[in-house]
Amino acid sequence: MNRLKDQYLKEIVPALMSKFNYDSVMEVPKIDKIVINTGVGDATANAKVLDSAVEELALITGQKPVITKAKNSIAGFRLREGMPIGAKVTLRGERMYDFLDKLVTVSLPRVRDFRGVSKKAFDGRGNYTLGVREQLIFPEIDYDQVSKVRGMDVVIVTTAKSDEESHELLTQLGMPFQK
């Protein structure tokens, strides 16, 4: 079993139950899924750019990404409906805990001038969104193989009913929030 999931079941669930006075173990918030999304605006001009982004996302997550397509046409961006413009991966189960563990312990500390992640990125329903400016912070990405530095969005979806519960859950899981 994953280290983070083991910690969640043995330490975090009892701690959250006592802090928020839950009656049942099923009320305790847990991480439902993690969605990693990267937008590739250059894909409209050059289709090969998208292939490298998909390959990098697959290396980072260990799962094949889904190519996202444009929902509507925007003439100013020379974009037609149905054109491929990005890639996303939805992680659940073991891979989700593996990715979160790697993100918190290895990748985020590698960010330059890192002082913690923002506390304001909760959406009001207990979900947390984190923007990563460059894919180079992940250990799987080789610096010499990167054609262009790309960012990505990491959305952590929880079953928490409020931001306070979600914040406490992520803090217990080791997410380094700003002081």
Curated annotation (Swiss-Prot):
Keyword Cytoplasm listed: no
Record's GO cellular component terms: cytosolic large ribosomal subunit
Keywords: Ribonucleoprotein, Ribosomal protein, RNA-binding, rRNA-binding, tRNA-binding
Gene Ontology biological process: translation
GO molecular function terms attached to this record: RNA binding; rRNA binding; structural constituent of ribosome; tRNA binding
InterPro entries referenced in this protein's UniProt entry, alphabetically: Ribosomal_uL5, Ribosomal_uL5_bac-type, Ribosomal_uL5_C, Ribosomal_uL5_CS, Ribosomal_uL5_dom_sf, Ribosomal_uL5_N
Pfam family, one: Ribosomal_L5_C
Subunit structure: Part of the 50S ribosomal subunit; part of the 5S rRNA/L5/L18/L25 subcomplex. Contacts the 5S rRNA and the P site tRNA. Forms a bridge to the 30S subunit in the 70S ribosome.
Family, similarity comment: Belongs to the universal ribosomal protein uL5 family.
Function statement: This is one of the proteins that bind and probably mediate the attachment of the 5S RNA into the large ribosomal subunit, where it forms part of the central protuberance. In the 70S ribosome it contacts protein S13 of the 30S subunit (bridge B1b), connecting the 2 subunits; this bridge is implicated in subunit movement. Contacts the P site tRNA; the 5S rRNA and some of its associated proteins might help stabilize positioning of ribosome-bound tRNAs.
Protein name: Large ribosomal subunit protein uL5
Provenance organism: Listeria monocytogenes serovar 1/2a (strain ATCC BAA-679 / EGD-e)
Organismal lineage: Bacteria, Bacillati, Bacillota, Bacilli, Bacillales
Gene transcribed to yield this protein: rplE
